[in-house]
A protein has these predicted regions:
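Short, P/G- and charge-enriched loop/turn segments at secondary-structure junctions
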Residues: 56-65, 144-148, 174-177
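Short connector loops at helix/strand junctions that flank enzyme active sites
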Residues: 70, 97-102, 151-155, 182
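Nudix hydrolase/Nudix homology domain
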Residues: 2, 7, 18, 93, ...
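Intrinsically disordered, low-complexity terminal tails and inter-domain linkers enriched
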Residues: 1-52
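Acidic, metal-coordinating catalytic segment for phosphate/diphosphate chemistry
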Residues: 2-10, 46-80
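A short coil-to-beta-strand element that immediately follows conserved catalytic motifs
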Residues: 127-138
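Conserved Nudix-box catalytic region and its N-terminal flanking loop in Nudix hydrolases
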Residues: 83-123, 127
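Active-site-adjacent beta-strand/loop module that shapes the phosphate/pyrophosphate-binding cleft
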Residues: 140-173, 188
């Protein structure tokens, strides 16, 4: 699932075709779809490579038992065909410890909706008003190993239905931090059936049961707010 590399000017400027789309407005054959890779190297201005890990850990605060904890918001970006935009990333310490997940990230002082659309713009270049977000549709509690430590995260998931034009004009890796550039590898559109096929071949997707969840969210959310607990400590 390797992706074509994307130059810095493409990541911060005008058009990069995401897999499965074409400029004429149609959909490319899914079997020919390939992800769009993230340009490696420095992130935002002022973030030296030696401080990348520390800057990532600054987003977390000790929980009651001392485990690093943060709140996060995520956006399930769905195109008119019901495909979801996912990000492929890996651990700081182990490139083979990798998985696919939805757009989003840690929250600052802002609310979940505001944080979700901020993360959406930073990671994809797509700007959306918080009022366009549907949900929350999923509340996820997660405890996992990352950067050689156990961390804990509570996530709120929203749906954003994008137009074909928004999907085609997305700019993967638009404004990533240095930590994100180091650990994020690829953006790609996925159909639920493709997710199931990839899982059968050994790929990991979060949240657990993502393909089935998408089918409850598209073409219309069934109105149920689901709760998921994931533990990935190995």
């Amino acid at each position: 699932m390797g992706g074509a590399s994307m130059s810095p000017s493409e990541g911060a400027g005008g058009g990069v075709d995401l897999p499965g789309t074409d400029r004429a407005g149609g959909s490319a054959n899914s079997q020919e779809s390939r992800g769009v890779g993230v340009e490696k190297g420095a992130g935002r201005a002022g973030e030296a490579s030696g401080t990348v890990r520390d800057s990532w850990l600054d987003e977390w605060s000790p929980d009651a038992d001392g485990v690093p904890y943060r709140r996060a918001a995520r956006v399930v970006v769905l195109d008119p065909e019901g495909r979801v935009l996912l990000v492929h990333g890996h651990d700081f310490d182990d490139v083979d410890h990798s998985w696919w997940f939805t757009v989003g990230g840690g929250l600052g002082e802002e609310g979940p909706r505001e944080g979700a659309v901020r993360e959406l713009r930073e990671e994809t270049g797509v700007s959306a008003d918080p009022s366009r977000l549907v949900g929350p549709v999923l509340l996820r509690s997660d405890e996992f190993r990352f950067a050689a430590r156990t961390v804990r995260q509570d996530e709120v998931f929203f749906i954003l239905a994008v137009s074909g034009e928004e999907a085609r004009s997305a700019k993967p890796g638009y404004d990533l931090t240095a930590a994100e550039r180091e650990t994020l590898d690829e953006f790609r559109w996925w159909r639920p059936a493709e997710i199931r096929e990839a899982e059968a071949e050994g790929e990991t997707f979060y949240p657990a049961g993502l393909a089935g969840l998408i089918e409850t969210w598209w073409p219309e959310w069934d109105g149920i707010v689901r709760n998921v607990t994931d533990r990935a400590l190995e």
